[in-house]
Amino acid sequence: MILVGQFDSPYVRRVAISLHTLGMPFERNTLSVFSDAEAMRRINPLGRVPSLILDDGEVLIDSSAILDHLDEVAGPDRALLPRSGPTRRHALRTISLATGMIDKAIAIGYEHLLRPPELIHAPWIERNRVQLFTALRALEADAPEVGWFGGGRLNQADITVVASLAYVRFRTPWIAPLPDLPKLQRLSAAAEALPTFTQCLPAIEEIGGPLEEARAGLARFQGTA
C-alpha cells in the first residue's frame, strides 16, 4: 500500500498512525496539495489528501473511507472503531468533534496564509475560533482521567483526537491562547510517546517555510514549545 500525503495533515497522520497500530506495512508518497496539485489530482480528482493506493492499484480517498477499509481488513477483534452499540456511538461522536476541530483550525489557517492582510475577515476567524474552543472544551469534559477514550485499549477516537490536538497546537500562533486542557494534554502526551505516533511526525520539509519557523512549528506540533 502507498499512503499519499504529508504528515503535517492530521487526516494523513491519523491514517498513518492507524496503519502502524494495526501492523500494516505501507510506503509513502509525500506529494503536497499545494506544490504538487496536478500530480495529486491524477491520484484523487479532488486533489486532496490522504489517498491510499492498494496493492492492486485501487485508490481509496478520504480518511474516513480509508479507515473503514483498514478496520474491515483487520477484522472485528482488531478494528480500531468499536463494532456496535453505545461504545461505537461514543467513539463516532468523539471523532466528529475532533475532525470538526481540524476543519476549524484549517479555516483559520487559510484565512491567514492565503488571503492578503487587508482581506482577512476577523468575524469569520472569530466564529471558527469559538466553534473550535467549544469542541475542545467538550472533549476535555469527556476525556478520561486515566487510560484512553476507548477504555483500556487505544482506539480510533484516541488517534483522531491526538492528531487533531497536534494540528491545533501547530496553528496556535493564530488560535492562541488555548484553554486549559489537563486531561487532553495527559492523553496526548501518552499517545505521542508511542512509536506508532512518533513515526508519524512531520518532517521539517513538510512543515515548510524558513528553517527557524519550521522548527518552532514542529515543536508546537509535538507539544514541546
Question: What would you call each of these model-derived segments?
Answer:
Residues 201-225:
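Acidic/histidine-enriched, glycine/proline-rich intrinsically disordered or flexible terminal extensions
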Residues 98-189:
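GST-like fold's C-terminal all-alpha helical module
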Residues 78-83, 148-152, 177-178, 198-203:
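Short, hydrophobic secondary-structure boundary micro-motifs
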Residues 1-123:
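GST-like domain detector, emphasizing the conserved glutathione-binding G-site
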Residues 141, 191-209:
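Charged/polar, low-hydrophobicity segments characteristic of intrinsically disordered regions
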